[in-house]
Structures are given as structure tokens and as C-alpha cells.
């Protein structure tokens, strides 16, 4: 009888422990559920367009641009550079060796604003060159001749290398004055790189078109500083675009779990990572208890929960009257395109486009005025208004 009583008590204690465990799990999940108070509502899409496949068979299309004759140049993350004409893709030869690991690989591609005269194409990719094992983000320029890259010039290589697979960035954009900006993520060393201007990574860089350092860069002459740095305190910027209406460079970056940001890039500005963040770590623990601090630039908008943004483009085309003057951002996580409605530098509305299309890696407005989206596993699609 005594033994039976002990067994019953043990079973009861197990049940009580299970109940308490469930309660604490519920409390933990509830407390860590990410809700942004007074957020701008995300409107459902109004499908007044059709989608047309421009080219298929590109598994992770990352960057895209257009030659003067309308030929597209597309990067595929694993390390293939394509030119696409009339739906047919052809591999461009003589690409430097790409370090294809994790989130690294062949990344962005843009043309020089005066491409018709000088023929320069700019590319970022992860490279093994330099100090240490692994790789880091590199910027080159080259010319295209007879389907092959020639006159390849190294413009900047972040260092040291690391075998970590995350946060390479990278996007490239020219401003109205002809300076080139490119991004490099913090390579997974968020307590080391982003806040230290003597180290690469977690930065937006600004260079002359030949890779030299502009004399008015903010950290020129500062002892030990990487003089190419224009802004710092970034996590993993995968959106970079010049606002055609103001000339300012806009950026978006991945937060951790929550806290993806849209920022307007300012000279010498600190964007806070990881000192401040609106997100939490992937295990639910806190990275920082603060989301704002003096002398740290606040984002003009942040997503909570994360959408995992990739690619961004301002719409200037008359083909899309309801979208003109606003911003498009791809979502990897939720697999749609987000129309971010603007009133000058203020976000006033949000709307879904191309719902369930797949992981949107990039978005761009072509020289023909159409919007093109790069979707993982599908290739490049064109949005045609009805």
C-alpha cells in the first residue's frame, strides 16, 4: 500500500511538472512574440497585372542590370554570370573564382553610369583572396568583350577572411555625383566588426569609380580607420538604391529575429548594430535592451516580425501609376514583393504584390520601364500591368 502511494505521488509530480513546463513554454513564446504597436497596416494586393517569365533555370538570381542593347546581365549566387537575350541565357566567361559558402557567392552587378563611353561593369562577390581562411566580400570592375570579362580590376576587398557562412551583403549603387557605394555584412561577428571603423564588415563603403578613396570620406586621415567606410553599425545590408527624387542613398538590412530596417545613408553615421536593435536573437534571448540611443541613426522604418528583405527599387515608370514615386522591397521570408508607399522620406503605406511568388531575391526597374523580379528557383519575371 505504501509503495502504491509513492508511485501515485511520483506520477502526480510528473504531471504537475509537465503542466508547469507547458505554462512556462507558453509564457516564453508569448513574451517573445514580436508585435509592432501602431504599425502601418499591410494591405492585400490588388492584382492588376500579369507575370511573364523572362528567363528560367537560374536557381538563386541575385543581381541584374541591362546593357544598352537591352541584354540583361544576371548574377547567379553559385558563381555563374549570365547574359540574357530574348529569353536565352549564356554564361559569361573569365569570372574570378567565387567563394560559394552559406550566404556568400556571386552577388551584385551594376553598370557604370557612363557605361556607353567607358564599358565598366561592377561586381561584388565573396572571395578567398587575402588574409585568413574562408572568404569575404570583394568589389571588382571589368569590361565585357565577346562573352568574356576582360581588364578585371580589383577595387576593394574586405578583410580578414572567415569561414563563417553568413552576412556578406552585398549591393552596389552609384549616386548622382558618380561615387560608388557597396555594402558588406558583418560576417557573423556582430560584437566585433560593425562598431569598429578600423575593421571591415558591417559597413557601407564609398569609393571613386576607379576604387580610390574620395578625399571627403568621413574617416580619411583618422588613425587606423578603413578610409573607404562611409557609414557603419550595419548588420547585413542586401538592399541599396539611390532615391531618384532626392539623390540620397537608401539601404535596407536584415535584422536578427525581427528588426529589419530601412535607412537613409548619411556620412559618418552609426546605424547602431548591435548596440541597439528592434529584434532578438534566434534563440529568443536579448541582444540589446535598447532600440534607440543618442548619436545613433534611427531607421525610417523597421519590420517586426522580419520579412527578410532583399533587393529594393524606386518606381519612376509611368507604366505603374499607382506605384510611381514609391519603393519596392523583396521579401525572402514571406515570398512577396512589398510596395512601400512614401511621402517624401516618410513611410505612409504598405501593400503586398505578387503574393506567394517565391523567395524574392531582387527587384529592379528596367530601361523599358517594366519592373523585374528575381525569384529563387524560378529566374527573372516581369510585371506587366493590365
Positions of PLM-derived features:
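Conserved blade-ending motifs and adjacent loop-strand segments that build the rim/top face
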Residues: 347-367
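Beta-propeller blade signature
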Residues: 137-147, 197-209, 265-266
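Short edge-strand/loop segments of extracellular domains
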Residues: 144, 254-260, 264-271
